[in-house]
């Protein structure tokens, strides 16, 4: 029997359009200390061009009259960041998908299910981004820094241990 919380969770199968990874263009990213309550396209490049200045403690910028302080954060070596989007178009069930990557014909695939299968693709890539904090630099305790340590931690945990 499922609890009320579990019943409300939507389950999806996510398919990556790997060809979009090759076509993704480099992007400049800013991770802001706020939430934008809009889900849709916005002409950000037209209205958000930060005048970043080097302050005594790092990068500084004003956003809607508030002082933000930040620093450049590099993606861990050997990794690349991608900006991903969910495709909005409905895939015809039972018909071949013209956008599907070639080279996967020898793999057996499950049939697609309407409202269950989702497709994502990359629109941009990045190797660094600017991490902003409100009034102070986020510092080493920022959650994003913890997330960026996971790949190296996972590699260390799963590495072969030499027998003595």
UniProtKB/Swiss-Prot annotation:
Subcellular location: Nucleus
Origin species: Homo sapiens (Human)
Further comment found in the protein's record: The T6 pseudogene located upstream of SRY on chromosome Y is derived from the transcript of this gene.
Task performed by this protein: Non catalytic subunit of RNase H2, an endonuclease that specifically degrades the RNA of RNA:DNA hybrids. Participates in DNA replication, possibly by mediating the removal of lagging-strand Okazaki fragment RNA primers during DNA replication. Mediates the excision of single ribonucleotides from DNA:RNA duplexes.
Tissue: Widely expressed.
Subunit structure: The RNase H2 complex is a heterotrimer composed of the catalytic subunit RNASEH2A and the non-catalytic subunits RNASEH2B and RNASEH2C.
Modified positions (N-acetylmethionine) in chain numbering: 1
Associated clinical condition: Aicardi-Goutieres syndrome 3: A form of Aicardi-Goutieres syndrome, a genetically heterogeneous disease characterized by cerebral atrophy, leukoencephalopathy, intracranial calcifications, chronic cerebrospinal fluid (CSF) lymphocytosis, increased CSF alpha-interferon, and negative serologic investigations for common prenatal infection. Clinical features as thrombocytopenia, hepatosplenomegaly and elevated hepatic transaminases along with intermittent fever may erroneously suggest an infective process.
Family to which this protein belongs: Belongs to the RNase H2 subunit C family.
GN (gene name): RNASEH2C
Gene3D superfamilies in UniProt: 2.40.128.680
A GO BP entry: RNA catabolic process
Protein name (Swiss-Prot/TrEMBL): Ribonuclease H2 subunit C
Nucleus among keywords: yes
Gene Ontology, cellular component aspect: nucleus; ribonuclease H2 complex
Disulfide bonds: none
Keyword Acetylation attributed: yes
Annotated Pfam families: RNase_H2_suC
Basic and acidic residues bias locations: 91-103
Disordered: region residues: 91-112
